[in-house]
Amino acid sequence: MSALVIAIDAMGGDFGPRSIVQACIASLSATPSLHLTLVGQPSLLEELIASHPAVDRARLTVTAASETIGMDEKPAAALRGKPDSSMRVALELLRDGKVQACVSAGNTGALMALSRYVLKTLPGIDRPAMVAAIPTQKGYCQLLDLGANVDCSAEHLFQFAVMGSVAAEALGVARPRVALLNIGTEDIKGNQQVKLAATLLQGARGLNYVGFIEGDGLYRGEADVVVCDGFVGNILLKSSEGLATMIATRIEALFRQNLVSRMVGALALPLMRRLQADLAPARHNGASFLGLQGIVVKSHGSAGVEGFQSAIARALIEIQENLPQRLHGRLEDLLP
């Protein structure tokens, strides 16, 4: 099996490189063909790696970068003022063909700005979009955009729909059902951008557009791809994560209330743990930047070891499915 090589921005995220290094070592154990390049401060990274003496150093290398982009740093400042940041160096490794994907838990705005500057977008795409898998009653739905583009035109929403459809196909969904997130399913509902995007999608050949969808329809699994602007998508994603955590916490509290509830809880514990694992945000961590000339996956800044592993796993799937090339081919067919 040929090697799968990924660059890791080891200095990004809320918790620093320790949990990232742990996630990388766990990913190497799970995937024998995986090779990782950690980008960041060599002395710090080598010290962290040394605490895992069993790791195969032939598959885990370190590339030096002297600067780190802060989580609250403005994208423009990061783009102009930090040419040797771990994030930028990781993206340049991807641009130069030394790795096949880049994963970062760093500043989202800076990652998007640097990705567009270093990698460029695919022909026909104005703006990349962030997409992630959301659990539904019937499986998963690809939701985009998740915050990269707060204000979107109808044309941008149309491009997101095309990219989301291709991504879903790459993940094994035949003729993905594509829907626009809206405040109602009737044609008269929604703002002007959503209505115009619907008109564009209705006329798109080769795209399985099923109309508008409301938030509850998303969770019922009524579409495989749901499209919205980044303002709405980011709120929906974080609300979903918060709701899942709240439900799990409330159920655990109910099972601890008295002796009877504790007995019932003990019987239900295996099922509850399975449900919690299914809905846990860490399991679904990893948002892809679609529309770039390269694979970039954004991990949640607060992701721990398991969450960062999930982001690496998403990058692996996209490498194996040759996603940017597939996108490029389908975009030529679908975009006007």
Curated annotation (Swiss-Prot):
Q: Where are the transmembrane segments?
A: none
Tell me which EC number(s) this protein carries: 2.3.1.274
Can you cite an annotated GO cellular component? cytoplasm
- Identify the pathway: Lipid metabolism; phospholipid metabolism
List localization entries: Cytoplasm
Taxonomically, the superkingdom here is: Bacteria
Task: Give all cystine bridges in this chain.
Answer: none
Q: What catalytic activity does the UniProt entry give for this protein?
A: a fatty acyl-[ACP] + phosphate = an acyl phosphate + holo-[ACP]
Oligomeric state and interaction partners are given as:
Homodimer. Probably interacts with PlsY.
Provide the function of this protein: Catalyzes the reversible formation of acyl-phosphate (acyl-PO(4)) from acyl-[acyl-carrier-protein] (acyl-ACP). This enzyme utilizes acyl-ACP as fatty acyl donor, but not acyl-CoA.
Q: What's the protein name? A: Phosphate acyltransferase
Organism listed in the record: Pseudomonas fluorescens (strain SBW25)
Q: Which gene encodes it?
A: plsX
